[in-house]
Amino acid sequence: MAPDGAPVDETGTLVHESGGFLLKRDRGGTFTLDLRRTPVDLVEKRVRITGWETRPGHVDVEGIQKYRY
């Protein structure tokens, strides 16, 4: 069963800020990310995330990986 909210499949730059993580989206804007693990090896790198937008601007991340153009 899928979580409540809209599915998300986005690319951008992973940023560590204020004790949490943000995705600076390639399409503009940001998402605040709820992550199950701390992806220190991906900070300040381009990534692709998948998950669910649980409330406006907040994503429960199911997957995160390094992304190339």
Tell where the protein language model's regions lie, with residue ranges.
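OB-fold and OB-like single-stranded nucleic-acid-recognition modules
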Residues: 1-69
